[in-house]
Amino acid sequence: MNYEKIDSTIPGPGISETDWNDVFEGCNCEAECSSAAGCSCLINKIDNYTVDGKINKSSELLIECSDQCACILLPTSCRNRVVQCGPQKKLEIFSTCEMAKGFGVRAGEQIAAGEFVCEYAGECIGEQEVERRCREFRGDDNYTLTLKEFFGGKPVKTFVDPRLRGNIGRFLNHSCEPNCEIILARLGRMIPAAGIFAKRDIVRGEELCYDYGHSAIEGENRKLCLCKSEKCRKYLPMSATPIE
């Protein structure tokens, strides 16, 4: 576990200062930030979160309020700030006692469906840096998370690597039947953050997992999946190239 701990994703090699500082214009809310109040950060005219902080999956583009917003001066906490506030639930790193699986994360208390677990935080890096690190750490576990989106019909990829700098999110294991999922959130800037939310109610002591995605690897290079769920696909999802 030799890495630098950070609270949220930071810019790394391959990400220009201009791209990282491409921020949204903030809202001018003087009261609660909600769709009913006309908060400009809620561009879908739908609240991103319920009053008790659960994710509203009807929101197609999740933009949280930020330091550019007038609501930062409000005496009460803005309802449209969840991912940026970090984990609010007790999370525990533990040894899974399986050498191939290593460490994992479990719930230290009950987590309700839709509640925020943690961000998958690391360095936001460029494609060339992804490929360079893949060569440098060849044979080691690959921590890089590829966030895939489409804008104007064109694919856009964001790479988050917590190998050197990261948070507890780097320890969440894969499951073919996960209790968590990744939802992209924009925390005042165009570059998204990876928020991990509970897909269903989770009991204390239960391991937290999300689905790493579909595999593009066939044959001998595949690794066995150890999730032990009834829907197990037998092999871990793996990309054919570092930037997929």
Curated annotation (Swiss-Prot):
Pfam family, one: SET
Chain positions recorded as S-adenosyl-L-methionine binding sites: 101-103, 141, 143, 170, 173-174
EC number: 2.1.1.-
Reaction(s) catalysed (UniProt annotation): L-lysyl-[histone] + S-adenosyl-L-methionine = N(6)-methyl-L-lysyl-[histone] + S-adenosyl-L-homocysteine + H(+)
All residue ranges annotated as the Post-SET domain in the record: 221-237
Broad class of enzyme this protein falls into: transferase
Residues that, per the record, bind Zn(2+) 2: 27, 41, 65, 69
Residues the entry annotates as binding Zn(2+) 3: 33, 65, 71, 78
Any one GO molecular-function label of the UniProt entry: zinc ion binding
Swiss-Prot/TrEMBL keywords: Chromatin regulator, Chromosome, Developmental protein, Metal-binding, Methyltransferase, Nucleus, S-adenosyl-L-methionine, Transferase, Zinc
Cellular localisation: Nucleus; Chromosome
One cellular component (GO) term of this entry: nucleus
Binding positions for Zn(2+) 4 per the UniProt entry: 176, 225, 227, 232
SET domain mapped to chain residues: 89-213
GO biological process terms held by the UniProt record: methylation
Residues that, per the record, bind Zn(2+) 1: 27, 29, 33, 39
Domain notes: In the pre-SET domain, Cys residues bind 3 zinc ions that are arranged in a triangular cluster; some of these Cys residues contribute to the binding of two zinc ions within the cluster.
Recorded family membership: Belongs to the class V-like SAM-binding methyltransferase superfamily. Histone-lysine methyltransferase family. Suvar3-9 subfamily.
Protein name: Probable histone-lysine N-methyltransferase set-23
Organism of this sequence: Caenorhabditis elegans
